[in-house]
Amino acid sequence: VGRVTRAAAAPADPWSDDAPAIAGRREFEQVGDGERYVLTLQDVPIEFEAAHLRRVRDDLHAQVTVRCALSGARVYQDTLTVSTENLSSASHRFRFARVLEHQSRAPQIDWTRLFDEFAIRVLTAEAAGRPSVLLSDIPDRLDDGYHDVLGVKLATHGISGFYAKGDSGKSVFTLFVLGELAKRGIPVAMLDYEWEGLPHKKRAAQLWPDGQQPPIRYIQCTRPLREEAESIRRDFLHHGIRYFAIDSVVPACHDSPNLPDTVIAFNRAARYVAGTQAGQLWVGHVVKNKEIADGDETFFGSVFWGNLIRAGWFIKAQPSIEGGPLICAYHHRKRNGLPQQPSVGIAIHFEIGRIRITRCDLADSAPDLAAGLPLWQRM
């Protein structure tokens, strides 16, 4: 939304219903799937924006930004004020309108009616929701809906997951996956909640030592995903990102990962970032319980982590012998819309100035890991 242009306040007879602020042209826009709403007055330089919408005890709250270019208004960079407001409450709206009147130094403008109109438009749009469509009208995709990297299949538009104990090579293989997708012409990005950019840059140089590093966009995240989702989404839309990884999910949470509400909020933020154009990979750790049987491993925290992913891979690593590769078994644990995939052996070779990642035969390279393969794959 462009910035409003500074202009004079409304002319004569400002109190009537014919005043420009009341009777003038306006444009109301819903951004995305209701992530933001914007009301722009065409004849008076005023704009309302509501973002970060959420329900609190059935009332709709939002961060409201009011931009104004009226002469004499108390603004900072065209912003009159920013405040979290209860759009469902008439008394709260009235109080906020008084703030707008004071800051704008324009008592001739009926701020109460303007803000009421904006709130009612937002409430109506939220109540309308998304219209239904016929399943038969949903467009088909040209591919099978999965990326394949060394036999590990990941949903192109849904949520995939890697989960394992520490020191299982999750992060380096995640970087490798992003690079391989980038080499196929798919714009990719990493959201890093554990480390910083320079180590990943050095790893990328070792993974692709020929100097032809694939383009991987990188964001070092310091706040919970739900708080950074808006800025990340704008960046991803600007760069056309079609696949991204979150490494790792627990530091990206706003509250305990054991709580269903935390996972649901995380999922909503991640889906908002992805929009309709991008697939995503969640990287996490497993529950630290030695009594868990093979095949029952899951993300650390609430069961909702495993329930929400569409393609899930549990990683089990065998400690490398000095000078040897790190051997990892990727076991296909979640398979919505995808037939059961065989477990995949991945060898990570840490060499001088280089990291090589190859597929390997677990029976030959790591018999102990091969013993954990499903019976049908060992026959």
Give the ranges of each region predicted by the language model.
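C-terminal regions of RecA-like/P-loop NTPase motor modules
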Residues: V1-H61, G72-A73, L237-H238, G275, ...
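Core recognition of P-loop NTPase motor domains used across DNA-transaction enzymes
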Residues: G2-E47, A51-T156, R223
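The Walker A/P-loop phosphate-binding site
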Residues: V38, D116-G211
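Conserved inter-motif catalytic segment of the P-loop NTP-binding fold
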Residues: H52-R57, H61, T65-V66, G185-I264, ...
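Short, flexible loop segments at the rims of nucleotide/cofactor-binding pockets, characterized by
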Residues: I138-D140, Q220-R223, P257-L259, N289-A293
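A generic local structural motif
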Residues: Y146-L150, L175-F176, A229-I232, F266-A269, ...
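Conserved catalytic network of the ASCE P-loop NTPase/AAA+ motor domain
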Residues: L154, L181-R184, W208-Q212, D235-H238, ...
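Phosphate-binding/switch region of NTP-binding enzymes
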Residues: G161-Y163, D167, S171, I264-R356
